[in-house]
């Protein structure tokens, strides 16, 4: 599974210049930040041979959505075994999301909008289509936990004061 879900290597991170199209962590809602942080921290826990759900538990209890860590573990485990190619999950300290992290966040946002078929179709590009719906079911449960805790996946627009 670790071969399919990977971090960006440090040389690639050094060579990469900030793209206008990359989504930044500071532009995400609290729910979006928690989701991306969880993907990244899940991978760190797997690499350290620690149980990922246990490693994430305190953050989810503090966020008011206990059991979110279990759903993240299920989603990431399924993606790890069913992905068609290596999935890029970036280092916890990275400010910009990878294309794969952006795709996963987009799928959650589609689920929040009730667009289950569209979310599954987007996931088909990343993983074996037969399991896309399973990931969507689990991700939708996760989305529900976030919403019940007051953590939306869509961020408010960036506002500036105009005088």
What are these regions (language model features)?
Residues 1-163:
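Polar/charged low-complexity regulatory segments
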